[in-house]
């Protein structure tokens, strides 16, 4: 009896942490550059998309509570792989290279068009897309292209406005309303990675998508 209580007491802090943040144990799996290297089409995948400087990597780190999970490059556009992160068995986050790929070369940018098209058209595991946008510069043409891609394949998407601490509450609300009116998104969220605000709601939505 004592041993059982001892084991439960030692395990409780970790269980409690997972209850607070179910993304806490998210781990990097691998990166791919070609459609043929995609893993088996099973489980649930959430695609993370956004411009090179939208704060997507910082958001992923804040979402999971692991500041070292996604490497934050000092030169936006360096990442050229789709990186797979496993939240739990059968539930993955896919980090797409930032739009523009300004430092990756024109030929590399051309390669991603067919890859994304094939992924959206054929991937049964794709559950939803998070479209990260700097709240100060939302709905750029490249953002709208991603949104149109989601809508053309009937893939649910959620605009996530980053760096919300950089604007006033008035501008924050107006921007959320603008994005809501401009898109057919299921919801619009505002987050701040530096202040760690907005992530509790984002986690609940993602867990809801997993369990849907």
Cite the ranges covered by each PLM segment:
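Conserved G1/Walker A P-loop phosphate-binding module
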Residues: 12-101
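Canonical P-loop GTPase G-domain recognition
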Residues: 23-33, 167-212
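Conserved nucleotide-binding/hydrolysis micro-motifs of P-loop NTPases
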Residues: 78, 91, 98-101, 136-138, ...
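Conserved nucleotide-sensing/catalytic segment adjacent to the nucleotide-binding pocket
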Residues: 89-126
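Conserved C-terminal guanine-recognition region of P-loop GTPase G domains, centered on the G4
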Residues: 118-186
């Amino acid at each position: 009896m004592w041993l059982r209580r001892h084991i439960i007491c030692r395990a409780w802090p970790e269980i409690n942490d997972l209850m607070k943040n179910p993304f806490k144990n998210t781990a990097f799996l691998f990166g791919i550059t070609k459609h043929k290297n995609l893993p088996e089409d099973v489980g649930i995948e959430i695609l993370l998309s956004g411009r090179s400087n939208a704060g997507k990597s910082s958001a992923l780190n804040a979402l999971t509570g692991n500041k070292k999970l996604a490497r934050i490059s000092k030169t936006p556009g360096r990442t050229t792989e789709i990186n797979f992160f496993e939240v739990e068995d059968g539930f993955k986050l896919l980090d797409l290279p930032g739009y523009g790929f300004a430092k990756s070369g024109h030929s590399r940018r051309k390669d991603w068009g067919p890859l994304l098209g094939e992924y959206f058209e054929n991937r049964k595991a794709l559950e939803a897309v998070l479209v990260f946008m700097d709240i100060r510069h939302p709905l750029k043409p490249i953002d709208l292209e991603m949104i149109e891609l989601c809508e053309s394949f009937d893939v649910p998407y959620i605009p996530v406005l980053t760096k919300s601490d950089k604007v006033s509450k008035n501008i924050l609300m107006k921007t959320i309303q603008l994005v809501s009116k401009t898109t057919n998104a299921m919801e619009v969220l505002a987050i701040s990675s530096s202040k760690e605000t907005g992530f509790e709601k984002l986690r609940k939505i993602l867990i809801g998508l997993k369990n849907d």
